[in-house]
Structure formats: structure tokens, C-alpha cells
UniProtKB/Swiss-Prot annotation:
Membrane topology per record: Peripheral membrane protein
Pfam families: EFG_C, EFG_III, GTP_EFTU, GTP_EFTU_D2, LepA_C
Source organism per UniProt: Staphylococcus epidermidis (strain ATCC 35984 / DSM 28319 / BCRC 17069 / CCUG 31568 / BM 3577 / RP62A)
UniProt GO BP: positive regulation of translation
Domain tr-type G: 11-193
Domain of life, source organism: Bacteria
One Gene Ontology cellular component: plasma membrane
Sites where the protein binds GTP: D23, H24, G25, K26, S27, T28, N140, K141, I142, D143
The protein, known as: Elongation factor 4
Functional description taken from the UniProt entry: Required for accurate and efficient protein synthesis under certain stress conditions. May act as a fidelity factor of the translation reaction, by catalyzing a one-codon backward translocation of tRNAs on improperly translocated ribosomes. Back-translocation proceeds from a post-translocation (POST) complex to a pre-translocation (PRE) complex, thus giving elongation factor G a second chance to translocate the tRNAs correctly. Binds to ribosomes in a GTP-dependent manner.
Class of enzymatic activity (EC top level): hydrolase
PROSITE patterns linked: G_TR_1, G_TR_2
Length: 607
């Protein structure tokens, strides 16, 4: 392809992604766009075509971003190349969204005609505006009985400042308005600006591992050209590789001769190590490198930590491999080895939030066949000790003794909730109960209120979202972002079984709630831990002080069953022998702890 052809081609490229709150019909709209541009044979068409993971289909959510190239013949007679980058909508996957947006010039903003704008919609809009993207607003599901497209159009104007005339009314399910959206993409989304003659700059926005071909990186070319045979250099690490294949996704992988300015495609360069192709890095040519790397998107730091332990200790190394492979296209997943007296060897793993944690666990169990026990999640606490040193604690078992600590700081988040009017009281009460501090409240219209609170992250990560949904009959939407660490009066609660501390059940709690939580947890454990041959005391302790206790009764084994009638002294002898046996067992006995018991720490608030 000569210089002029590359410039002409660039003018007809449109790169866009679809952003929306969960369940506003994003994946269905992506399906319709694929269908209407004849990108997929009718026989291959299926719902949620871009959601390739089984888990995504089952839960009906998008977890991984996906990029696909489409051809569209517009009414002006030109043929355009569209690159559609599908993104997730859940608050835990914001970083996936920010990655996709870094590769685009425009975004289709999908809003449900019945639900209207939700917290996550706003969060994604601000992300798109930070990336200077053009927005194409679409009100979807207009054929629903509860749809109120006019109210939603008004809302878009009032809350985001979008002109009502620019809004497209559509129903992805019934194929209404799709043609208009495709034409709007041509008009509204700008062509990429970049110089095909300049040194190569390509942004890696995703990567996956193929056991045969090595790392396959999804890239967006900002400047320059790349083709098979080129020697490329990663700007973050300085490592060099030879390109063996470049290609595009249609959604299947299709090798092409070259990728040039504005193209979104994939590159394979015999990269064997996951760390050498980090998402957010810039690729350039080894012999003619670019001066400085592209602005990657912001690195997301894990917020929630938990221990993952294989049920069978032989799987320890397999678990490490599984985590490394998942980490390849999940830059925010972090892990380090950890050992626990109760659970053996495993990994302390960091996640963005609870959904992220569940999904990683489920993927390890499904894709790698490793059965796991997960400990209760915790957040990072900063402790200033009396000797002036500072320690970060992400595992309650490692918390220093209280008498050595001068101050403890915990992370606080700004939680934004959009709630129907009738439930404001219930939501405020929930936030108060979770140690929240009221910041402000805006009425969007007669029906909905935007409430902002500052809440400790440790209260949010457990089951805040579930409780928010049940307190508002499912109508609330929720988004949160980290603000700062603040000092709190926190204590470490230890759980003792049969007098021994179980490190995996320790948790950190605010002193005001310590007694209730300790009491609730020992009662809960009493029902979850199977009865043993001997009585097991379950205690909750802060330091040396026991704050709650209960006993798990022993199973009675009838040692007299073989004793028919007969001598009382014989029976007494058998009972004495049983008693001595139980005492010995109690001294050396191990208490079996089921997985549910480790998760009981989470569910204490439900009682």
C-alpha cells in the first residue's frame, strides 16, 4: 500500500466503543451492528456474539473487552472500516472500559428507555469525555411497555448536556434505528489522526496467551505501519521481538499484510513471557523508534484482597500458572505466595472488587480445573507503629499487636448511588449502618435522587451492593471511587476453635461493632462446623480478651450398644474408657472446617 492509499484509507476509518450501564442492551446492540454490516454469516449469528467466555453468556454480562473490524457501505457511496470495541459495564471492570476508550475516537452511549441514566452510565461518560471522545447518544429498548424515551432524552440533556436532537431512538432487539446509528457513526465519529510516515506507535490494549503461538496482543496503531518481519521494541521494557503475523478480528482472527494508522488488530511476535507484552505499553520499531511512549490509561490498583488456597495441596504450582495466565490480560490482578496454618500454601490475591474476585475464582475452577478455598476478602490498612515505622496490611492475620500500633488508617471511597425517591430513607439508613458520612444529595427529576456518601471500602466490598439492591427492590445503581485513607478505631478479631487461633478466620472490625460481629460469627460458625466426637468451644477474641463464646456439642457415640442387660460396672468401665478417649482426642484433635465457614465472615450483616 503506498503513502497516498494509507492516507485515503485513514479518512474512512471509524473507531468507536459502546458504553452503557449493565443490562442496558450493549451486547445486543453490538450483535445488531455486526448483523447489519453483514460481518457475520447469518448461520454463525448467536446472541452476545462478542461475549466469548461461557461465564459471560451465563451471567449475561460482558467481562472482557473485544475488538472487531466491520465494513459498512454508507449512503454517501463510500465504504467505511468500523472498529467496534465492546466494553464491560460493571463498576469492577472500569479499567477494561478505560482501555477500550484509549483506542477509540468516539463512543456510542446506550441508555435504557425505561431505566434512564444510572450511576455507571455517568462514570463511563466522564471516562469518555476525559479521553476527548465524541459521544453518540442512543436511547435503547423504546419498544418496552415501560419505555419513556422523551423523559430519558430530557434527562440526557439535563444531566450530561446532550442536545435532544442528537439522540437516536432505537431497539436493538427489534432492529429499530440501527441503520440510523450506522450513518451517525460515519458523521459523528472523527477519522483517526495519525501519520503513516512517522515512526511506529501502537497501543497494546489487550493481550491473551495462546499455548502454540505465544502472546497475541490487541493493538491500535496511532502512527506508522507494522507488518510481518518487522523487529519491534516494547517501550516499557526495551525488549525486542520479530513480528511473525499481523491481522484483524472479524470476529475471527484473519492475517493481513500490514496494519497502518487507525487500524485496530492483533500482532504475534513469538513472545513467550506474559510480562513482556503488558497492556498499556507502546510498541515501536527497533530500528526507528518513537521518541516517547503513548499516554497509557491509568493503572488500576487492586482494592480487595483474599487468600486463594487449592483444596488439594498438589495443585499449588498449577494455581500459580493459572493466575499468571489470567494476569496476562488482566493487568489489575496481583498475587503473591502466602501460607496459612489452617489452609496450607496458597496465594494472597488482589482484585478490583467483589465481582472481579468471584469471576477470577470461577474462571480458575472452570478453565484450569483447580478446586479452591477462598478466605474472606479484606482491604489494605496502613498502620503507623509506636516506633515510627509504617506497615501495610492486606491480610488480617498479619496485623501487628494492638499495643504496638499508634494509628490505623483505612481506605475510604466516594459512593454515588442513584435511587428512586421512595427509597431514599432506606438507602441513607444502610449507609449510616456501614459507617458512611453524608456528602450531598441531588434530585435529578421527580422520581430519582443522586446520593453521595463517603464510606469505608471495607464496608462496601462485602455485600453493600446486594443490600443496596434489596433495600431498593433492585432499582438503585451504584458506583464508587477511592478517595483517601482516614484514621479509624479498628481492632483485629481472632477466632479460636478448641483454643487454637484459626488465622484464616481473623478479620478487622471497627471497635464499636466488634462485640456484635464477634457474637454473630461464633453463632454462625456453630451451625456451619460439623459436630466432632468431642465438644469444641468457639471463641471470638480481641487480643487476650474473649468477647464471645459458644460450644459445638459433641456427637454421642453409643458405646453401650453391644452391652445387653448385664453388669453396671461393665457399662461404667466402657463409659470411662470413652471419656478418656475423648479427652485424648480433644488434646490432639483437628477440627474440620468447611469452605462455608470461611465465607461466614462476610455474611454477618444479613442476620
Amino acid at each position: 500500500m503506498d503513502k497516498q492509499e494509507r492516507y485515503n484509507r485513514r479518512e474512512n476509518i471509524r473507531n468507536f466503543s459502546i458504553i452503557a450501564h449493565i443490562d442496558h442492551g450493549k451486547s445486543t446492540l453490538a450483535d445488531r451492528i455486526l448483523e447489519n454490516t453483514k460481518s457475520v454469516e447469518t448461520r454463525e449469528m448467536q446472541d452476545q456474539l462478542l461475549d466469548s467466555m461461557d461465564l459471560e453468556r451465563e451471567r449475561g454480562i460482558t467481562i472482557k473487552l473485544n475488538a472487531v473490524r466491520l465494513k459498512y457501505e454508507a449512503k454517501d457511496g463510500e465504504t467505511y472500516t468500523f472498529h467496534l470495541i465492546d466494553t464491560p459495564g460493571h463498576v469492577d471492570f472500569t479499567y477494561e472500559v478505560s482501555r477500550s476508550l484509549a483506542a477509540c475516537e468516539g463512543a456510542i452511549l446506550v441508555v435504557d428507555a425505561a431505566q434512564g441514566i444510572e450511576a455507571q452510565t455517568l462514570a463511563n461518560v466522564y471516562l469518555a469525555l476525559d479521553n476527548d471522545l465524541e459521544l453518540l447518544p442512543v436511547v435503547n429498548k423504546i419498544d418496552l411497555p415501560a419505555a419513556e424515551p422523551d423523559r430519558v432524552k430530557q434527562e440526557l440533556e439535563d444531566v450530561i448536556g446532550i442536545d435532544q436532537e442528537d439522540v437516536v431512538l432505537a431497539s436493538a432487539k427489534s432492529n429499530i434505528g440501527i441503520e440510523e446509528i450506522l450513518e451517525k457513526i460515519v458523521d459523528v465519529v472523527p477519522a483517526p489522526d495519525g501519520d503513516p510516515e512517522a515512526p511506529l506507535k501502537a497501543l497494546i490494549f489487550d493481550s491473551e496467551y495462546d499455548p502454540y503461538r505465544g502472546v497475541i496482543s490487541s493493538i491500535r496503531i496511532i502512527d506508522g505501519v507494522v507488518k510481518a518481519g518487522d523487529r519491534i521494541k516494547m517501550m516499557a521494557t526495551g525488549k525486542e521481538f520479530e513480528v511473525t503475523e499481523v491481522g484483524i478480528n472479524t470476529p475471527k482472527q484473519l492475517p493481513v499484510e500490514e496494519l497502518t494508522v487507525g487500524d485496530v488488530g492483533y500482532i504475534i511476535a513469538s513472545i513467550k513471557n506474559v510480562d513482556d507484552s503488558r497492556v498499556g505499553d507502546t510498541i515501536t520499531l527497533a530500528e526507528r523508534p518513537a521518541d516517547k511512549p503513548l499516554q497509557g490509561y491509568k493503572k488500576m490498583n487492586p482494592m480487595v484482597f483474599c487468600g486463594l488456597f487449592p483444596i488439594d495441596n498438589k495443585d499449588y504450582n498449577d494455581l500459580r500458572e493459572a493466575l499468571e495466565k489470567l494476569q496476562l490480560n488482566d493487568a489489575s490482578l496481583e498475587f503473591e505466595p502466602e501460607s496459612s496454618q489452617a489452609l496450607g500454601f496458597g496465594y494472597r490475591t488482589g482484585f478490583l472488587g467483589m465481582l472481579h474476585m468471584e469471576i477470577i475464582q470461577e474462571r480458575i475452577e472452570r478453565e484450569f480445573g483447580i478446586e479452591l478455598i477462598a478466605t474472606a476478602p479484606s482491604v489494605i490498612y496502613q498502620c503507623i507503629l509506636k516506633d515510627g515505622s509504617e506497615v501495610s496490611v492486606d491480610n488480617p492475620a498479619q496485623m501487628p499487636e494492638r499495643d504496638k500500633i499508634e494509628h490505623i488508617y483505612e481506605p475510604f471511597v466516594k459512593a454515588t448511588m442513584m435511587v428512586p425517591n421512595d427509597y431514599v430513607g432506606a438507602v441513607m439508613e444502610l449507609c449510616q449502618r456501614k459507617r458512611g458520612q453524608f456528602i450531598n444529595m441531588d434530585y435529578l427529576d421527580d422520581i430519582r435522587v443522586n446520593i453521595v456518601y463517603e464510606i469505608p471500602l471495607s464496608e462496601v466490598v462485602f455485600d453493600f451492593f446486594d443490600q443496596l439492591k434489596s433495600n431498593t427492590k433492585g432499582y438503585a445503581s451504584f458506583d464508587y471511587e477511592f478517595i483517601e485513607n482516614k484514621e479509624s478505631n479498628l481492632v483485629k478479631m481472632d477466632i479460636l476453635l478448641n483454643g487454637d487461633k484459626v488465622d484464616a478466620l481473623s478479620f478487622i472490625v471497627h471497635r464499636d461493632f466488634a462485640y456484635e460481629r464477634g457474637k454473630a460469627l461464633v453463632e454462625k460458625l456453630k451451625t456451619l462446623i460439623p459436630r466432632q466426637q468431642f465438644e469444641v468451644p468457639v471463641q471470638a477474641a480481641i487480643g487476650q480478651k474473649i468477647v464471645a463464646r459458644t460450644n459445638i456439642k459433641s456427637m454421642g457415640k453409643n458405646v453401650l450398644s453391644k452391652c445387653y442387660g448385664g453388669d453396671i460396672s461393665r457399662k461404667r468401665k466402657l463409659l470411662e474408657k470413652q471419656k478418656a478417649g475423648k479427652a485424648k482426642m480433644k488434646a490432639v484433635g483437628n477440627v474440620e472446617i468447611p469452605q462455608d465457614a470461611f465465607l461466614a465472615v462476610l455474611k454477618m450483616d444479613d442476620e
